[in-house]
Amino acid sequence: MLILASSSISRANLLKTAKIDFKQVGFDYDENLDKNISPFLYVQKIVLEKEKQFLSALSKDFQNQNLLFADSIVCIDEKILTKAKDKKEAYEMLALQNGKYASILSAFLLVKPEKRVFSLSKTTLYFKNFDENALNDYVENNLYKSKAGCIMCEGFHQNFITQQVGNLSTALGLDIQTLKAYL
């Protein structure tokens, strides 16, 4: 059995859809890292920091188990977008994407008793212009919350994607194809 060390609903749904036996263990991570580094390095550091925090608090409970740590960020050029703190920040992030593109970087660390596997994947989504009413509904109903870069591929953004380069599962927060290869 896999231990998903995350409270992410999207990642749990991806594992269920892939028929991977898992148990979800939520943990409140401190994800405050310096964003003045490359997005690729940033997301990897976040995942390693999640592992460190989780194991320092709960290592006795999860010895010799298969643990999965993951994180996703959105970047536009080299600008890192994490989760919006409020509606103002959500509107700012969505304005950067409107009629443009955004890349989702998803990293995971699979810790097994006999090995460690680290993966970094990228999916780029190209968007047509957002409908203003749909955009306002999305933000005002707080649907952007807990979404990296306010991107909701399975919801709001779905109607505005004109091109996808990379796996949908990466955009949703976990490269399932790569993970399955190492389970």
UniProtKB/Swiss-Prot annotation:
One MF annotation (Gene Ontology) recorded for this entry: nucleoside triphosphate diphosphatase activity
Record EC number: 3.6.1.9
Active site: D71 (proton acceptor)
Cofactor section: a divalent metal cation
BP-aspect Gene Ontology terms: nucleotide metabolic process
Domain of life the protein comes from: Bacteria
Predominant location: cytoplasm
Gene Ontology terms: cellular component: cytoplasm
Any one Pfam family match given in the protein's UniProt record, by short name: Maf
Compartment list: Cytoplasm
Substrates-to-products reaction catalysed: a ribonucleoside 5'-triphosphate + H2O = a ribonucleoside 5'-phosphate + diphosphate + H(+); a 2'-deoxyribonucleoside 5'-triphosphate + H2O = a 2'-deoxyribonucleoside 5'-phosphate + diphosphate + H(+)
Role according to the record: Nucleoside triphosphate pyrophosphatase. May have a dual role in cell division arrest and in preventing the incorporation of modified nucleotides into cellular nucleic acids.
Family, as annotated: Belongs to the Maf family.
PANTHER family: BIFUNCTIONAL DTTP/UTP PYROPHOSPHATASE/METHYLTRANSFERASE PROTEIN-RELATED, BIFUNCTIONAL DTTP_UTP PYROPHOSPHATASE_METHYLTRANSFERASE PROTEIN-RELATED
Protein name: Nucleoside triphosphate pyrophosphatase
Organism: Campylobacter jejuni subsp. doylei (strain ATCC BAA-1458 / RM4099 / 269.97)
